[in-house]
């Protein structure tokens, strides 16, 4: 795998479009692509897969081994670090049970987002400031730069682990089924975009999605720690409130503003300008649009959360996502537990 960055262009980056421009140009490009595809069908799909998909068996094996490694590492961290920490800090039982999951996800998303931010903002890759450049010089079977390949290995193996973890390790929640769909779609996007060498746009998607998960898990940890050892800790409560506001803002800005205007505009419209016969155009854009739909779905939880706060129905941060079915049927919280109704709105991302 090569380490060379994308070839720089002398032209000034194209200004980011408005929502209306993005929708109009993307629809026109997609319609033209559909009308010009005379041989679209399973035959073309099979030929495109055979000619343009490059994913070696050793790469798949390495991803599976890393997924097993994530699972083992999470178990070890939960057993030897997170649970003893919760016990030492004298967290409420419900909070102590949820701390390992949030702590684990915070560490992963913080590390991966920091790495992706470094690649996009600290190196010569122009993809964040010039999203159409993700398709400049694209070639079928081109070498993947080693630093982007590392990001793909981390993310792909983690989402493979996350499918297992959602079913067998995480608390079951209202949107866990949607979360499973999200993980499957994300893993399919990661594997296929790597195979078809759309890794540049994948790096941008990683960056735009992981930042909100960092804030979510950090905020949830402060919610768990704000009432511990029989006392209320105002600092953690303040940080949780500020983190909630920051999370809501970043969710909209990164996933509902930048994601469609940078990523979807580049994949739906600009891709055909750079590579008129780009393979699997509709397949990838349908998956990315499905990801956008799920982002909007979770944003509805955020709106419901904000509405409860603004109307005074909620005096403490309450989890609109987290719930345990058995606990909901049997548990009756005591007075000391009421200020600890915790959580936020959503749990991750591509």
Curated annotation (Swiss-Prot):
It is found in: Endoplasmic reticulum membrane. Changing residue 210 to N: Decreased ceramide synthase activity. Expressed in brain, skeletal muscle, heart and perigonadal white adipose tissue. It catalyses: a sphingoid base + octadecanoyl-CoA = an N-octadecanoyl-sphingoid base + CoA + H(+); sphinganine + octadecanoyl-CoA = N-(octadecanoyl)-sphinganine + CoA + H(+); hexadecasphinganine + octadecanoyl-CoA = N-octadecanoylhexadecasphinganine + CoA + H(+); sphing-4-enine + octadecanoyl-CoA = N-octadecanoylsphing-4-enine + CoA + H(+). Residues 97-311 form the TLC domain. PANTHER family: CERAMIDE SYNTHASE 1, LONGEVITY ASSURANCE FACTOR 1 LAG1. This is Ceramide synthase 1. The gene is Cers1.
